[in-house]
Amino acid sequence: MKNDPHSASTALPTESLVPGAAPTLEVNITAALASVDVMHHGRKVTIMRNQNQSNMVTPDFAQTSRKCPPFCIQPSELAPGVKTIAELDVLHFLKKISDGDASIMVIDSRTQTWVDKGIIPGTVNIPWDTLNIGESEPAAMQAILENQLGARRQDDFWHFDNVKTLVMFCNGPWCGQSSTTINALLKIGYPAHKILWYRGGMQDWESLGLTTLKPLSK
């Protein structure tokens, strides 16, 4: 596997997410990290944990049992070369993006109904059904691949030499929206080492009381 500077295995220590910051809250992210500032649609948003120690997970993510299929438990390893990551890694990548690294994108693969319930600050919504080979509208899919992900089409072949590193997620371990997108990208040749999967998704993010936002009105 190629050595990718954005690989989660090379993620900086969490202390480096907020240089010089010392935890001053009662509910911190780690023992050495209170919060992380990221940019979301041009404004600074502070990601931290809910300080109400009686707070419970939102009802949208309290349900334990959903019909399977489609809501089936996802594997811990999605595909060879695709690294599974967790919350501290996601925060690391969101911070890098906010600091100006345009080679990374954290993608929320959920459809609008789910997105309306809440989003992770600093992420970009590209619904799974817009990147589903054979089902998505071809011109729209090509536009996403070229304009947002950095792929290029030449002589009826896709070229991925300068594509972005993608961190992808959806609702969590019981949701297949991000895994469907990842498998679709791999099928057309997107490099596996350029894809990271936040398997825990919104379920785990909400369970840890991390900051969410409501999406901007379109």
Q: Model regions: which residues?
A:
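Catalytic cysteine-centered active loop of the rhodanese-like fold, especially the PTP/DSP P-loop
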Residues: 142-202
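Flexible, polar/low-complexity N-terminal or interdomain linker segments that lie immediately upstream
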Residues: 1-105, 109-117
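Positively charged, proline/Ser/Thr-rich regional signature most characteristic
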Residues: 73-164, 215
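Sec-exported extracytoplasmic/periplasmic mature domains
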Residues: 95, 99, 186-190, 206-210
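Active-site neighborhoods of enzymes that stabilize oxyanions during catalysis
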Residues: 208-218
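Short, solvent-exposed loop/turn and secondary-structure capping segments
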Residues: 117-121, 138, 178-182, 208-209
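Solvent-exposed loop/turn segments at secondary-structure junctions
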Residues: 111-114, 130-132, 172-176, 201-205
